[in-house]
Amino acid sequence: MKVLHLSDLHMAPWQRKKQRFVRELADLEPDLVVDTGDNLGHRLGLLGLKAAFEPFRGVPGVHVWGSNDWWAPQPKNPFAYFGGPSGVPKQPERLDTEALRAYLDDLGWTDLNNRTARVTVCGVVIDAFGTDDPHREYDDLAALGPGLRGLRSRKVRPALTLGVTHAPYRRILDAFVDRGADLLLAGHTHGGQVCVPGYGALVTNCDIPREQVKGVSSWTHGGRTAALEVSAGLGTSIYAPVRFACRPEATLLTLTARSA
């Protein structure tokens, strides 16, 4: 099964090259798209996002929000990130999150913001759950309880349990492992965005270990271990459009059955 992980597009309507790149990812013929948020980078960003995502219409997908699906970016001092995870900006501009939700629903993608769902992809049953953005503390892990109990009461057992969030804070990853996730997907970090060759990321913008700021690794908690993939994402804030030694990325994961 091919899973396309998209994150942190921070889309603005004039970003035609990025829109074209995302459209062309449909040629990879993914079986499932996982969107881990921060889709919008401008109050008119949905226009560009529609241009990018339209080729995925009909492809199963799941999504969660990042803070930039709720609030427009603002100018800030980039050196402030060295003092720890970024805070809440003053008087941010509210984005049209409901229009974004309606569009992703129309594509056929399932909303996992503090929700659970069962999806079937290529005949494979997947139980999925997710949270709204932990960076803004919009996550509500308690809200997952009834849905998870309902999924586990079904006769058909899932082949895979997927945990999806925007920002990979330790408390969220721990909770996902506790709730039975086999695979964890997140974004938010931009892979550090500015990295030092031979050393890696300087900051993570959350509390995940620096060496797990991007890529595939594992996460262990309470005696269980799950696979973890953190995307470096495809975009940046329009007010800090710089990456160094950290290329933008979309990730195609190929999942195979465990050997008997």
Range-by-range predicted roles:
Residues 16-120:
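Core catalytic region of metal-dependent phosphoesterases/phosphodiesterases
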Residues 62, 168-251:
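Conserved beta-sheet core of the metallophosphoesterase superfamily
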Residues 39-42, 67-71, 119, 133-136, ...:
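Solvent-exposed loop/turn segments at secondary-structure junctions
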Residues 76-109, 115, 121-165, 170-174, ...:
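Binuclear metal-dependent hydrolase catalytic cores centered on His/Asp/Glu-rich metal-binding motifs
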